[in-house]
């Protein structure tokens, strides 16, 4: 039996939640914002002995201090305006709102990434915020791990948020989790054939999941630099996916930098 008090490796967790209106969309991707607030509350309590950097609005900040101490927690004020100021927001939005992008798959037309302004900007910002944490390193830790604020409430991936799972990950470079992915003509909106070309493979048979990833400070900095360059290049060529698509490409291109743990099935 795993006891939560057992110490984890020296690490800083980075997370975020932001109400983008997902609870109001009339499609299969609708989720109440309470799912994210309760998930974040679970995460903050579960890792209350671990340094955490949280990106939230001023309205959600009281949730953080219900369970967290000031000496091991930092709050980064984050709003929709924060997302709008990201350097890639305009280019992302131009592709997101184009009919040609939405027509790549039926599911994409009604997806949160298509319908919600700020959704793609937020998920694409995860690595930047992780790198910011590694650069500042306010708690003097050796590793930096991104965990989605809603991960503890995700029906397919909640187990990845448990202390026992995180403790079992050997993070010596840049650790990612992958799943088999062999269907669809696109990968989160990114043309599958183009993705394979970027990956340097004939066919992309697995993708990286974006709910949990991280590494040493040096590895995070190196991956972040590669990620920013790749994001610029793919957007310049009209390609748009999510952070999972970009991390998938980088994990294929740089296998010695990445440590990949394959999860069972598409979960």
Question: Which residues make up each language-model segment?
Answer:
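A short acidic (Asp/Glu
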Residues: 24-25, 63-67, 154-160, 187-189
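GT-A fold catalytic core of metal-dependent nucleotide-sugar glycosyltransferases
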Residues: 118, 122-177
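Short, flexible, basic/aromatic active-site loop/helix in glycosyltransferases
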Residues: 188-203
